[in-house]
Curated annotation (Swiss-Prot):
Binding site for Mg(2+): D8, E62
A Pfam family it matches: ACPS
Enzyme Commission number: 2.7.8.7
One biological process term in Gene Ontology: fatty acid biosynthetic process
GO molecular function: holo-[acyl-carrier-protein] synthase activity; magnesium ion binding
GO cellular component, one term: cytoplasm
Main function: Transfers the 4'-phosphopantetheine moiety from coenzyme A to a Ser of acyl-carrier-protein.
Source organism per UniProt: Polynucleobacter asymbioticus (strain DSM 18221 / CIP 109841 / QLW-P1DMWA-1)
Identification of the protein by name: Holo-[acyl-carrier-protein] synthase
UniProtKB keywords: Cytoplasm, Fatty acid biosynthesis, Fatty acid metabolism, Lipid biosynthesis, Lipid metabolism, Magnesium, Metal-binding, Transferase
InterPro entries: 4-PPantetheinyl_Trfase_dom, 4-PPantetheinyl_Trfase_dom_sf, ACPS, Ppantetheine-prot_Trfase_dom
Reactions this protein catalyses: apo-[ACP] + CoA = holo-[ACP] + adenosine 3',5'-bisphosphate + H(+)
Record SUPFAM superfamilies: 4'-phosphopantetheinyl transferase
Organism lineage: Bacteria, Pseudomonadati, Pseudomonadota, Betaproteobacteria, Burkholderiales
Length: 130
């Protein structure tokens, strides 16, 4: 059964401006620990691809918060939802702290997809009952 659906789209340039304005602290505020490792690696290899990664993860968190119907209110926090990738490249969600407990208690799971193209990043999330 579908619990909720969320979508978010953003201009990568706007996220880049916020990242620059905060001297990179935006990534520390938004990304979970595993996402941060991937971000740093990608940013070091190719700055543009690193920022695109940050943008897709930002969009994923916004879309997820809409799908669960809470917005950015506890137990949903920026860092408590991580979007990681299976070896095949398929994006998957990982929950930390109170959000992990919330999702387990509700018996919910999230199905997520993220994409970026030149100047835009998008995420789509469907939350279902397990």
């Amino acid at each position: 059964m579908i619990i909720g659906i969320g979508t978010d789209i953003l201009q990568i340039e706007r996220l880049q401006a916020a990242y620059d304005r905060t001297n990179g602290r935006l990534a520390e505020k938004v990304l979970g620990p595993d996402e941060m490792l991937v971000f740093k690696h990608r940013l070091a290899r190719n700055h543009k691809r690193g920022i695109a990664f940050l943008a897709t993860r930002f969009a994923a968190k916004e879309a997820f918060s809409k799908a669960i119907g809470l917005g950015m209110h506890m137990p949903m926090t920026w860092r408590s939802l991580q979007t990681l990738n299976e070896p095949s490249g398929k994006p998957i969600t990982s929950y930390l702290g109170a959000l992990a407990q919330f999702m387990a208690e509700k018996n919910w799971e999230a199905h997520i997809t993220v994409s970026d193209e030149q100047d835009m990043a998008i995420a789509h999330v469907i939350v279902t009952q397990k």
